[in-house]
């Protein structure tokens, strides 16, 4: 029935002279989202709108599912597009549309007509009234309700084409990917960091990710778990380059030479340093973490102060004020929760002190870091140089 989808967007519409940049980015992301959907589609801007036109048979539910993951979209409207062959033809097409779209006709409705072509022989109010009358004649069981109709019939007269639709599937909102710069996500196998990546991507940020692997203490299944999480996030963010850093030697050096109650915070400091260096080399302008205040020892205010101090890039923590259940709710919504709870430990959970410091003093931490002098420099360089890059699409 539907050969086209009208894409509605929110914030993009107020971007003034730069609007086309955001619209083009949204078109690219829509095309990416449909690449694995069976069928052929044409995505284009036309008359101030974005349309997805189906050029072959397709699975309706699959298209809707893909489009509801595209940031920047606030509504997806399956439309029937007709040529302007006069009002009688329009009325017949509307009646045919309602007959097919709604098996139960015992519904209230409202007609909302709009014209961009002002030379149409009827104004919007006249179209509303005439179409409403034709609908009542065709379906006597339907009733008019202009305040809270069950069916809001939209009729848009644009140039020589008329759009007819009454269904609007909510989109995720946000901004198109790539319109707000690029950031490096510190991605672990936990619940929080995939959610953090999702949330900054929603604001138009392109995501790259870094995962710290510690073989033989962490398994290949733990690594695959993170790859799977990156794939889930990429359904929303678009392609992700995943940097897999071999962190074992650095962790062992910290374990052997630094106070055990400071293991977590010092390891976290080196993770931030490495992620920032990798990010600088690929054009990132910030770091993203899944830290939430007070959730674990490395996420107290004092601990976050210490890890922030080593970074020159801004550090974004989208879930900083969320409690655990709020983060879990989002992870379930985006489909990452079941993967995150798979029982494969990463390096953050293996080298953990029994009684980690919760109020680290930055000056003392820096002093204890000097225990690594003469050792850490070469290990750090090797970790950067041997980083494995995996492109997730």
Roles of regions detected by a PLM:
Residues 48, 244-250, 292, 345-353:
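A glycine-rich phosphate-binding loop feature that marks nucleotide/adenosyl-phosphate handling sites
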Residues 190:
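Conserved G/P- and acidic residue-centered "switch" motifs that form tight phosphate/ATP-binding loops
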Residues 185, 209-211, 244, 289, ...:
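Structural beta-sheet core signal
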Residues 1-184, 194-241, 309, 357-362, ...:
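RNA-binding accessory domains that recognize and position tRNA/RNA substrates
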């Amino acid at each position: 029935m539907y050969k086209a989808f009208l894409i509605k967007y929110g914030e993009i519409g107020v971007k003034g002279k730069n609007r086309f940049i955001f619209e083009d980015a949204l078109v690219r992301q829509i095309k990416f989202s449909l690449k694995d959907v069976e069928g052929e589609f044409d995505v284009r801007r036309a008359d101030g709108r974005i349309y997805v036109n189906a050029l072959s048979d397709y699975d309706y539910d699959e298209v809707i599912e893909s489009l509801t993951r595209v940031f920047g979209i606030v509504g997806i409207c399956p439309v029937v597009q007709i040529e302007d062959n006069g009002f009688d033809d329009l009325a017949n097409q509307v009646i045919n549309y309602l007959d097919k779209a709604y098996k139960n006709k015992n519904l209230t409705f409202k007609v909302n007509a709009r014209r961009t072509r002002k030379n149409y022989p009827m104004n919007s109010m006249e179209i509303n009234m005439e179409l409403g009358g034709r609908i009542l004649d065709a379906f006597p069981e339907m009733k008019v309700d202009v305040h809270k109709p069950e069916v809001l019939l939209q009729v848009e007269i644009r140039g020589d084409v008329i759009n007819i639709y009454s269904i609007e599937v909510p989109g995720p909102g946000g901004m198109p990917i790539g319109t707000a710069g690029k950031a490096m996500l510190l991605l672990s196998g936990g619940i929080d960091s995939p959610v953090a990546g999702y949330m900054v991507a929603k604001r138009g940020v392109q995501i790259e990710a870094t995962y710290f692997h510690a073989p033989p203490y962490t398994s290949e299944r733990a690594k695959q778990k993170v790859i799977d999480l990156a794939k889930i996030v990429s359904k929303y963010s678009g392609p992700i380059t995943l940097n897999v850093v071999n962190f074992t030697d650095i962790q062992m050096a910290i374990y052997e030479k630094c106070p055990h109650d400071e293991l977590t915070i010092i390891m976290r400091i080196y993770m931030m340093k490495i992620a920032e260096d990798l990010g600088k080399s690929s054009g990132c302008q910030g770091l993203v973490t899944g830290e939430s205040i007070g959730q674990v020892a490395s996420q107290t205010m004092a601990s976050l102060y210490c890890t922030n101090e080593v970074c020159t890039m801004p550090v974004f923590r989208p879930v900083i004020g969320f409690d655990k259940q709020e983060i879990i709710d989002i992870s379930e919504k985006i489909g990452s929760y079941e993967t995150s709870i798979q029982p494969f430990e990463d390096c953050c959970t293996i080298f953990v002190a029994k009684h980690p410091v919760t109020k680290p003093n930055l000056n003392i931490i820096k002093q204890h870091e000097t225990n690594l002098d003469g050792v850490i420099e070469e290990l750090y360089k090797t970790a950067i140089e041997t980083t494995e890059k995996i492109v997730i699409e």
